[in-house]
Design a protein with these regions (language model features):
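Cysteine-centric redox/oxidoreductase cores and disulfide-bonded domains
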Residues: 81-168, 173-186, 190-196
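Extracytoplasmic thiol/disulfide redox context detector
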Residues: 2-83, 87, 149-163, 194-196
Length: 196
């Protein structure tokens, strides 16, 4: 009897570990651009950050047109949530993600509609309502309770602090060096042109 119980426990633990490993395999870095690009930009962002939304509205479209679509730059979006609403949005953005950045752009374009609420629960409800209106198909409960995704998001933040001393958003890293100029397209373009 004890052997049977032990065998069942081992099977359950092994099955859960296998599921966890499978979940880890589907977590993909959100990025755009060629993997062979000479320049890699890493952006540390909080989905509730107004300056991050401004970057996506006013800088990113030109960056994409002039550098990313031409194969010169690859951009990777890293999570650096500054509050619980951003943390939950990061988990949702990473859940069932195929590596494309569409959901990130959707969240920034409607940031003022969902990134509000007096409680974390209210902000999460606003997020769910906003994405439902946008026809984004996500299992909210499953995504928000997924420990692997939670760890993935938190590890982005930890790595940002340890490796690049990130303390604000957005923080732009270009080929492993922090971009320390005012974040506008003119400055970014000038910097990138020197690297090409």
């Amino acid at each position: 009897m004890k052997k049977t119980i032990l065998l069942i426990i081992i099977m359950i633990v092994g099955f859960n570990a296998n599921l966890s490993a499978q979940e880890n395999q589907i977590i993909k870095r959100i990025s755009e651009g060629s993997k062979d690009a000479k320049i890699t930009i890493i952006t540390y962002e909080s989905l509730t950050c107004g300056h991050c939304a401004d970057f996506h509205k006013n800088v990113y479209p030109e960056l994409k047109k002039d550098f990313i679509e031409k194969g010169l730059v690859r951009i990777e979006f890293r999570h650096f949530p500054l509050d619980i609403a951003a943390f939950n949005a990061s988990k949702i953005g990473q859940c069932n993600n195929d590596g494309k950045s569409d959901i990130i752009h959707i969240l920034y374009s409607g940031q003022k509609k969902w990134a509000k609420g007096k409680t974390p629960e209210e902000a999460t409800a606003n997020l769910e309502s906003f994405l439902t209106d946008k026809k984004v198909n996500v299992d909210f409960k499953k995504c928000l309770s997924n420990k692997d995704i939670e760890d993935y998001v938190l590890n982005d933040r930890i790595e940002g602090v340890k490796k690049f001393k990130v303390n604000a958003t957005p923080t732009i890293i270009i080929n492993d060096k922090k971009f320390d100029k005012a974040l506008n397209y003119k400055n970014l373009k000038k910097y990138l042109e020197k690297l090409i």
